[in-house]
């Protein structure tokens, strides 16, 4: 049986690994997950990512987490906004700010998966996938 929400699974794995200071975490591979990882890397929330094969030959997205020191984390929280049961769409002029601009909303738009700031600059709306701060 397939997974209902691979994005939520990815965010939960990152959140859990981040809380126990893992260096990396393996996530289910999907195109959207790779695009979210690109945005997280670009905004500085993760150290990087790779696409690898597991022992069965399936693609796995390996996300490398980063920490400023041994006690603190860069990602304070990461939350799914739009869910399979309740999709959340916003117009280009109604894009929410996360913690008054300290956090980032990741939005799936017609221009690709981008941050809330980029979506405001391009004046393009879309589905709010998650919030990170």
UniProtKB/Swiss-Prot annotation:
GO molecular function: rRNA binding; structural constituent of ribosome
Alphabetized SUPFAM superfamilies for the sequence: Ribosomal protein S8
InterPro entries recorded: Ribosomal_uS8, Ribosomal_uS8_CS, Ribosomal_uS8_sf
BP terms from Gene Ontology: translation
Keywords: Ribonucleoprotein, Ribosomal protein, RNA-binding, rRNA-binding
One CC-aspect GO term: ribosome
PROSITE patterns: RIBOSOMAL_S8
Keyword RNA-binding tagged: yes
Role played: One of the primary rRNA binding proteins, it binds directly to 16S rRNA central domain where it helps coordinate assembly of the platform of the 30S subunit.
Oligomer and partners: Part of the 30S ribosomal subunit. Contacts proteins S5 and S12.
Recorded family membership: Belongs to the universal ribosomal protein uS8 family.
Record protein name field: Small ribosomal subunit protein uS8
The organism of origin for this protein: Syntrophus aciditrophicus (strain SB)
């Amino acid at each position: 049986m397939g997974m209902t929400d691979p994005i939520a699974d990815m965010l939960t794995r990152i959140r859990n690994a981040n809380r126990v200071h893992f260096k990396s975490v393996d996530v289910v591979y999907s195109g959207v997950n790779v695009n979210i990882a690109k945005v997280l890397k670009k905004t500085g929330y993760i150290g990087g990512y790779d696409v690898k094969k597991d022992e069965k030959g399936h693609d796995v997205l390996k996300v490398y987490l980063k920490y400023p020191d041994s006690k603190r984390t860069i990602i304070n929280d990461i939350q799914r906004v739009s869910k399979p049961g309740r999709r959340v769409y916003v117009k280009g002029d109604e894009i929410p700010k996360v913690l008054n601009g300290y956090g980032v909303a990741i939005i799936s738009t017609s221009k690709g998966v981008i941050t809330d700031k980029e979506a405001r600059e391009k004046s393009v709306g879309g589905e709010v996938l998650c919030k990170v701060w």
